[in-house]
Amino acid sequence: MKIDGTVTTGLGKAAYFLSQDFYVNNFKKNCGFRPYPGTLNVIVPEEYLPQINKVKNECKNIIKPDEGFGAVKYIKARLNDEVTGAIVFPAKTTHEENYLEFIAKDKLRDKLNLEDGDTVSVEF
């Protein structure tokens, strides 16, 4: 599945969670990279929500951390046909349903010179 979406600013909460060893170690082990402490937030058209929710609900990749932190489902993905990473689906989130959170080893706004409003493609 390949979806075009719009880059937007998040709430900055992912930086804290992606700095926790149990998340970092699991992503490194299962995805092959140590994630940059933050996500690239992408708003996708609502017409894709049924397919995204199906992928999320059927996803078997899950990190269940220590008490006090929420579980995270993830699926390997690519951004703009060039960056390998993953889309994360945190059990606890404040984002709307049509937000995808993409993680990678690099700060993608810098690496790809992205700004709010830019269009990106996400494939998973």
From Swiss-Prot:
Any GO MF annotation of the entry: magnesium ion binding
Q: Which residues bind Mg(2+)?
A: 39, 41
Task: Supply the EC number(s).
Answer: 2.7.1.161
Q: What is this protein called?
A: Riboflavin kinase
Gene name for this UniProt entry? ribK
Note describing how the cofactor binds: Binds 1 Mg(2+) ion per subunit.
Record-linked Gene3D superfamilies = Riboflavin kinase-like
Necessary cofactors: Mg(2+)
Q: Which GO BP terms apply?
A: FMN biosynthetic process; riboflavin biosynthetic process
Show the taxonomic lineage. Archaea, Methanobacteriati, Methanobacteriota, Methanomada group, Methanobacteria
Bilayer-crossing regions: none
What function is annotated for this protein?
A: Catalyzes the CTP-dependent phosphorylation of riboflavin (vitamin B2) to form flavin mononucleotide (FMN).
Xref: Pfam families = CTP-dep_RFKase (PF01982)
Please give the family membership noted in the entry. Answer: Belongs to the archaeal riboflavin kinase family.
Source organism (scientific name): Methanobrevibacter smithii (strain ATCC 35061 / DSM 861 / OCM 144 / PS)
Q: Which reaction does it catalyse?
A: riboflavin + CTP = CDP + FMN + H(+)
List the InterPro entries: RibK_CTP-dep, Riboflavin_kinase_archaeal, Riboflavin_kinase_CTP-dep, Riboflavin_kinase_dom_sf
SUPFAM superfamilies reported for this sequence: Riboflavin kinase-like (SSF82114)
Domain of life per record:
Archaea
The pathway that the record names for this protein is: Cofactor biosynthesis; FMN biosynthesis; FMN from riboflavin (CTP route): step 1/1
Binding sites annotated in the UniProt record for CDP: 10-15, 106-109
Cite the entry's keywords alphabetically: Flavoprotein, FMN, Kinase, Magnesium, Metal-binding, Nucleotide-binding, Transferase
Residue numbers binding FMN: 93, 101
